[in-house]
Amino acid sequence: MYQAANDRYEKMAYVRCGKSGLKLPAISLGLWHNFGDTGVYENMKEILFTAFDNGIVHFDLANNYGPAYGSAEKNFGKILKEELGVYRDELLISTKAGFDMWEGPYGNWGSRKYLLSSLDQSLKRMGLDYVDIFYHHRMDPETPLEETMGALASAVQSGKALYVGLSNYDGPTLEKAEAILRDLKCPFVINQNRYSIFDRTIEKNGLKDTAKKLEKGIIAFSPLAQGHLTDRYLKGIPEDSRIMTDGRFLKKSALTEEKLVKIRELNGLAAGRGQTLAEMALSWILKDGIVTSVLVGASKPEQVLDNIKAIQNTEFTEEELRKIDELSLV
């Protein structure tokens, strides 16, 4: 039976989420790719245990994480039931709904019917009475924002979520949503968005500035740009890489020779800081205190340990920041 490390809280920094009472670990663990039915169950357990032993208390899921849809929640729920659940009050568990989950008009987007039905299903798969954070997973251009935000508020009012969050929103829509949730007295605390040295969308669409103004947290996903910001591709594209074996999310065409040159230069900059490229990429996201936590994935426990090293050096010189911008901004 798993027993958590006694010194787990000495290994991680915890950051207040906006102006709320909730704190997140600087590094959080996402269960997007490696906790579905194609994963090895014992490896999933070791990844989660390694994370928790090192102070990572936040585990992020969504209804359709897998593959297959729902399988990441199901496997996570099994691990909770068998071993990790004794620490439930020390864990921050989130899930989401907003992308396609089941057939028909009620299995996608942002209707009240979809969101609340999906949350009930997620709780059942994980064997939980509530989640700590329930997110709407993406903006819905057709459903009234009042309906979607009302569904999030209902999740809290029914005791099925403690806090709510928004994922993949832009600045203007965030501002409108926040006003609705504030009127509903709903504890909206966090935004989840893609952010990395190579992807500055939240700087361009107003999300980062608006979240700061509204005193809401941000948790950044894909901080390593689907592996581009690691040593994985420094010598080209390996045959066993995700680009070659699974092109759904990462296309070979995205890794041009020009991009590889930039990656190698960034790697040299990281080495000068005494970091790996991945460590520097994570540190860069945390550099200004606006992003609360960085969401990392892991296919093996060792990757969790490597990612945690990023919190040891989040200070950058002006010259380092200038060079990073020069190599990454289009």
Regions found by a protein language model. Give the residues of each.
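N-terminal small/glycine-rich loop or linker at the start of catalytic domains
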Residues: G18-G36, S94-G107, Y130, Y135
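Short, acidic/polar
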Residues: T38-A51, G110-M126, L174-E178
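Hydrophobic faces of well-ordered beta-strands that scaffold small-molecule active sites
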Residues: P25-L29, F59-L61, L91-T95, F134-H136, ...
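Alpha-helix N-cap and loop-to-helix initiation/capping positions
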Residues: G39-N43, S71, N75, Y106-Y114, ...
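N-terminal binding-site loop/beta-alpha segment at the start of enzyme catalytic domains
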Residues: M1-L91, Q157
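Active-site groove signature of glycoside hydrolases
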Residues: L123-T143
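Acidic-and-aromatic substrate-binding clefts and catalytic sites of carbohydrate-active enzymes
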Residues: F35-V40, N64-A72, D140-P144, G171-P172, ...
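Beta/alpha (TIM)-barrel catalytic core signal, keyed to glycine-rich beta->alpha loops juxtaposed to Asp/Glu
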Residues: Y2-K11, T143-V330
